[in-house]
Amino acid sequence: MKTRITELFGIERPIIQGGMHFVGLAELASAVSNAGGLGLITALTQGSPENLKREVARCREMTDKPFGVNLTFLPSINPPDYPGYIQAIIDGGVKIVETAGNNPQRFMPALKEHGIKVIHKCTSVRHSLKAESIGVDALSVDGFECGGHPGEDDVPNFILLNRAAEALSVPFVASGGMANGRSLAAALALGADGINMRSEEHTSELQSP
C-alpha cells in the first residue's frame, strides 16, 4: 500500500507505532519495522542520552528497516537533557523523529540540518497548522479517543480527521482508537495518510517475546 506517509518514511504499510513510556524499546520498535510499519524508540524511557544511543544501536542489530525515535517535550522545573537527546538522535544516525508535547521549533534547525524528518503530534487543527508552519514533515492528529495525552478538545476522530484533511497540506496520520484494518480503512477514507497505533501493537503477537 502506498500513501504519502509510506513514501515519506520509506515504509511498506502506513502504520506508525506510537511512542509509549516503559515499553518503547528496541524490541517493540524493530518488530513493528520488520512487519512493514514504522517502529519508534521512546527517548525518555531510556533515562539518558547515552542510554538512547545504546538503544538505537540495539535496534539497528534487530532490523534493517526504517525506525525512529519519539521525543516528548514536557513542561518541568527540572527538564530532561533535551539537547543531549537531540544530539544522541543525530549521532545515532536516526532519520525520523516523532515529537510531542511542547512546540519543537527550537530543535527544528538541528534536526533539519541533519536530514531528519519530523512528525509532530497534535490534538487540534489549530495546533497542527502551527506545527506545519514551523516546518514539520508530517503530523499525528490525535482525537479524543487517544489515551495518555493532555490537550484534547473533546473532538473525536470522526470529526477531527475531516477537518484536518480540509486544512492541512502535509501528510498526517490518525491517532486514537486505531485497532485493525477497518480502522486503517476508515482513517484513509476520512483523509488521513495512515494510522498511529499504540496499545494494540503492544498486546498483539507483533511484540517480540
Task: Give the ranges of each region predicted by the language model.
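Short, glycine/charged-rich "phosphate-handling" switch motifs in NTP-dependent
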Residues: 193
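Acidic, glycine-rich active-site loops and adjacent beta-strand->loop/helix elements
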Residues: 73, 145, 177-178, 200
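Conserved small/polar residues in nucleotide/adenosyl-binding loops
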Residues: 200-208
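Glycine-rich adenosine-cofactor-binding loop
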Residues: 170-184, 198
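Active-site entrance/lid segments in N-terminal catalytic domains of soluble metabolic enzymes
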Residues: 1-168
